[in-house]
Amino acid sequence: VRRLVLMGSVGVSFPITKGLDEVWGYQPSLETMRRLMDVFAFNKGLLTDELAEMRYQASIRPGFQESFSAMFPAPRQRWVDNLASNEEDIRALPHESLILHGREDEVIPLAASLKLAELIDRAQLHVFGRCGHWTQIEHAARFARLVNDFLNEADQAAAGDS
């Protein structure tokens, strides 16, 4: 591993958001899927009936709901805490890291990425304004450019070492 890219990442503990609790507590229905998509995206223009239907259909495939609901049963704060890494372990990361986050993210609070950027010595943080949890969708071109440039720098550095 030469570099890390983190997008709307947990990594550190935080009080569970209403949005994350709703995502982890998802019970399949088309209406619930529409509400969840509202939580994921700042740009509501991206939220089409077709997208909601497609995601809903994926969520009702045999075995999906049973597996998903077993991952994060209530009370869910414990799962946020379990997904958090020890701060000393995070500080010890030697890798250059790109952290990407939507300012209006209702699933993972921006404060989580700010904390990661504070802990990781070689971190870069990019915050997308007017953006929810779907940074890779809501700002696709800029997201791809940032990630590609960041990873290509590592490839160029590695090629220079050989």
Language-model segments: what does each one mean?
Residues V1, P94-H95, R122:
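Active-site acidic short loop of glycosyltransferases
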Residues R122-S162:
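Catalytic active-site module of serine/aspartate enzymes centered on a nucleophile-bearing elbow/loop
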Residues F68, F72, L116, F143, ...:
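Hydrophobic "lid"/C-terminal helical patch
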Residues L114-A123:
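Active-site-adjacent alpha-helix of alpha/beta-hydrolase-fold enzymes
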Residues R2-R35:
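Flexible "cap/lid" loop of the alpha/beta hydrolase fold
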Residues Q27-R91:
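Conserved alpha/beta-hydrolase catalytic His-Asp/Glu region
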